[in-house]
Amino acid sequence: MLWLAVACVVVSSIGITPTSAPSTETGGDVTATAVLPLPSVTPTSTPMPTASVLPTVVPTSTPTPIPDPALLADQVYVYPQPLIAGDQVTFDVVPVLPQGNYEDVKVTITLPSGEMLTGQVNQQGFDQQQRVRFYWAWDTRGLSGSQIVTLTLDLPAEVVDPNPTNNRLSLPITLQSAERLAPPGPGVRWQSTEAAGVRLHYLTGSAAERDLPEIMEAASEASAAVRARLQSRQSQALNIYLLDRVLGQGGYAASDWVAISYVDRAYAPADLEMLLKHELTHHLDGGLGCDDAPTLLREGLAVMVAGGHYWPASLPRKAAVLPGTEAYIPLSTLVEDFYQHQHEIAYLEAGALLVYLEEAIGLQGVESLCRVASSDERSDRDRLSAALVESGLGDLVEVEQDWLRWLGALHPTSLETEALDLEIRYLETMRAYQRQYDRVANFRKGILFSPAAAMQAEITADFVRDPDASEAIALELLLRLAQEKLRRQDLTRASALLNDVRGALEYSPPWDGMAQDVLEVVKASLARGYEPYRVLDKPAQGGWLIYALDRADWPAQRQLWAAPDERGRWIVTGPQ
C-alpha cells in the first residue's frame, strides 16, 4: 500500500475450535518525498455487550496512570537498514502520548546541517498508531561516520506533561561505508521494459533481472487472464514494480501501479501468478465501479479472481472451516475496519463471500453491487447492506445467513481444519519474525514505500536491503521450509518447524535443535561466500541440501551440501 525494534512474541494457534454459533446480527503534512497513500481505515467503536438483567456490584478500579508524553530512542525507527552514507533516510517516530486524538501534536527533527523538519502526529499505518513519518527526509550524501539527529516533541497547551525534559531526544546515528553492503551492493539502479499489457520496472542485480523473460511471460498471461475474467476494456499498460526484498505480504498496489516482491529469500507465501492476478484486479476493479466500494468487496474480488489468497485453493471449502469457531468474523464486523481483523481470516471470508455472490447474481450483479455500495457516505456496513438489498438478495444479515447455509453444505474434513489453523499460525509466526528482525517489512508496523516515487527520485535501498544477520537468514530458511511442508500437507513437520522458529524468537543463540543446526549451516555458507535462500533436510543422507546465491557472481544460484563432521561441526561443500 511495509529493523531496529526488538519484540519477543510467541505465537500460538489461532484457535479454530468449535464454539457457539456465530451471530449474524451483529496523516499530517511532512516536508519530504511523496509516498504511497495507504487505504483509509476509519476507527469505529466496538458495541459493548448487553448489560446483565440483575444489577452487579462493580469494585472501584484503580485509575490507569496517564502516560508522560515523551520521545524514546527505541520508538524512533530509521530506514533503510543497514544505514549507508549517501542514503535518503526515512524516520518513523512513535511518541508516547496520553489516549486521545490531538490535532496539534508535532515532532521536529533537526538534522546535523541544522535543517529542521516538522511533521504532525496522526494515526498512520495499518496498526493505526499515533506517529509521524518523515519519508526520505535526510539526504546523507557527502556525510559519513557518527551523526547526531535531534528530535523535539511539541505539545498543545491542554496536554498534561509532568516531565517536559523527555520531550527532546538526541539520537546518534552511524553512517556506514558502502563496503559494508552485501551484494547487490550500492550500484543498484531502476530499469524498465514492456510486455503485453504491462510495464515492468526492476532493479539491476536482482532476481527479477535474472529471471526477466519468465516474469514477462507470467505478467502478460496474468494481465490477459484478469482482463478477460473482469471483462475489462481498459487498454492502458499497468506499471509493475518488482522489489528485491519482502515487503508486507509480498505485494501491494496503488491506483496506477503494483509492487510485487520477487526474491530468492522467499519466506513469505508469495506465488508470482497469484500476486499478479490479485494486484491486477485491484488495478482494474475501478472499471467495475469497485474503487470506492467497501474494502471487503474489493479484497474479496481480488482473492476470488486470483483463485486463492497465497496459493490456489477452493475458497468456499477453506472458509467452510470457520463458522462455529472462535476464529469466524461476522460479516457485519468484518466489513468495518477490514484491515484491523486477523489478516488471513478476513481475506478468506471476503473471497468466499464473493464466490457466493457471483454464483448468486453473476459478475454483472457484482459490478452493480460495487457501484451501489460506493454511492454515499454512510458506514461500510450500511452501504453494503443497502446494496445487497437492491441486488435482490436481502440485507447483510439475511445474506450472511444464506451464505453460512451454503458453506455448511460443504462439510470440510478435520485435515482441512488442521491445515487452515496451521496456515494461519505460519503467517502469524512470520509476522513475529518481521517484528523482531525486519520491522519495515511487517505490514502493520512497517512502511510500504512507493516504488513509483522512489524510481523518480532514483532511490533503491528501501527495496533491496533485507536483514543480513545470520540469525535472520536462518529463521527465514526455517519459515520457508515450514511453508513447503504445509503446502505438501506434511502438517506434523510444518508444526514442528514453526515451534523451532517460535522458540528461537524467544531466546538468543545458541538455539535448540534444528534452529541451531540451520544457523550453523548459514554461518558456514556465508564464510564461503554463499548466501542461503532455501534448505532441504535430507535425513537419509545425513545432511542438508542448500540453495544459495553466489556473492562473487551475484545473483547466480548454486547448490551446496552441508553435513556434520566427527565433532558435530557443520561442514559446507560444493557447489555441486
Where in the sequence are the language-model features?
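Beta/coil-rich, acidic/histidine-enriched accessory regions frequently appended to metallopeptidases
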Residues: S13-P18, P37-L38, T44-Q75, L83, ...
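A mature extracytoplasmic/lumenal domain signature
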Residues: L111, T204-S206, L242-V246, D264, ...
